Amino acid sequence: MGAGLRGCFRKRAFIALLLLSWLPFLVRAVQLYAAANFPQMAFFAPTAETFRQFLDQQSTFVFFVTVFAGAGLVANDRRANALQIYLSKPMTRAEYVFGKFAVLAILLLMVTWLPAMMLLIVQMVFSGSAAFLGRNLYLVPAITLLSLIEAVMVSAAMLALSSLSRNSRFVGILYAGLIFFTDALSGVLRVVTRDTGLAWVSFSNDLAQLGDAIFRVPLRYAMPWPVALVMVLALVAASAAVLERRVRGVEVVS
C-alpha cells in the first residue's frame, strides 16, 4: 500500500491534480470568511446543503483521480506478470486486493472527506463559534458515511475493471464508459418516461440519491433511496466476484 501511494506522489501530474481538487475548498473557505465577517455577504452563510453541494462538486475530481491512480493498480501487475510473484510470497489474495483497494480509497478520501471536514473546521475558526456545528452535528457522520460509500463503490469498481486487462489506458476507457453509458441511459429513460423513477440505472445517480438521503436534503430523483443502496451494494458485490476470479496466483500460507 505504501509503495502504491508513494508511486502516485512521485508523479507531478498527479500532485497537480490533487492540488486542483482542493481549489473548490479554497473558494468555499473564502465564502465562509466573507459570511462570517461581512453582513452584506450573509447569503454565503453555510447550511447543511452547502456541504452536500461541496461533495457533489468533488465528484469530478473523484473521477479523474480514480482513472489516474486506479486504472493501473492491477493491470500493471498483470502486464508485468507480477501477480504470480506477489501471491507466491506469504501474501494472500485478500491481502493483495485490500492493499490495492486501500491505495485508491485513501486517495479518494483526500479529495472528499478531508476537504469537507476541513471546511467544518474553517467555518468554526472564521465564525469564532461552534454554534453551526452544534446545530448540525450530524454533518460529521454524514460527510464520513457518504465519503466512505463513494470510496468503496468507486475503488471496488475500478479494481475489478483493472483486473480485466493488462492495459491501464484501456481500463480507464472502460471505467469512463461505465460511468458515461449509465448516465446516458438514465437520461434517455428520463426523456422517454418523463420521470426519474428509473434513475437507478446510473451509478452516479445512485450515489447522489444516497447522499441526499444521508444529508437530509430533498431527494433529487423519484426513486426510493434504498433502491440506490441496493444498486451500490450490487456493484460492489459484482466487483468482488470479478476480482475473485481474475486475481489468482500461487498462495503460500505462512
Predicted regions and their residues:
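Hydrophobic alpha-helical transmembrane segments of multi-pass membrane transport/permease proteins
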Residues: 12-35, 61-64, 174-183
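Long, hydrophobic alpha-helical segments
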Residues: 53-76
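Terminal transmembrane helical anchor/hairpin motif
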Residues: 33-49, 164, 169-249
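Secretory targeting signals
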Residues: 30, 44-59, 98-163, 212-215, ...
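Helix-loop-helix units of permease transmembrane domains in multi-pass membrane transporters
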Residues: 73-105
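Residue-level hotspots within the lipid-embedded alpha helices of multi-pass solute transporters
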Residues: 69, 73, 108, 147-151, ...
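A short amphipathic helical element positioned immediately N-terminal to and/or at the very start
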Residues: 1-9
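Hydrophobic/aromatic residues in alpha-helical transmembrane segments
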Residues: 66-70, 83, 114, 118, ...
